[in-house]
Amino acid sequence: EEMKIQAMKINTWGKNVYVKVPVANSKGKFMGKIIKELNNKNIKLNITAVYNAKQTEKILKLINKKTKVIISIFAGRAGDTGKDPVPEFSKSINLAKRYKNVEILWASVREPYNYLQAKQLGCHIITVPPAIIEKIENFGKSFDQLTKETVKAFLVDSKKSNFKI
């Protein structure tokens, strides 16, 4: 009930505001009731802490096809467990194609290559931290160029430690 009250208040902040709701509570219980209720009140939602296409499918079964919804799938955290998030994104994006009001967000970026993965899959949104954006600027460099830059960095490090290369 408290989440509903907060969501209603946040929704008054502006037309471009999305209310963030976790897909499940801290006990792992699916938050379908509140998702459906807020969606039916035309409150834009960012449903977060999603990890798989089954969760995406459960969300899609509840929502209408007019109120905007973002489904945030945590790719980096999934990858941290040794699981490839790409198949779950691919399935989720395909499921969401029937809903013009739904966007899939690639959350929890860990490396620049995630940007390319999200782009290749047709992900609608990707949240990229500044440190990763800086690394994306390396895209297009040749391996020979990277070798030269790496060895130059080794040279700088060796001079700092009074060693010679």
Language-model features, listed with the residues they occupy:
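Active-site beta->alpha loop and helix N-cap motifs at the rims of alpha/beta catalytic domains
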Residues: 1-37, 41, 75-78
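Mobile acidic interaction elements
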Residues: 5, 12, 159, 163-165
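Catalytic alpha/beta core domains of metabolic enzymes, predominantly
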Residues: 29, 41-134, 140-161
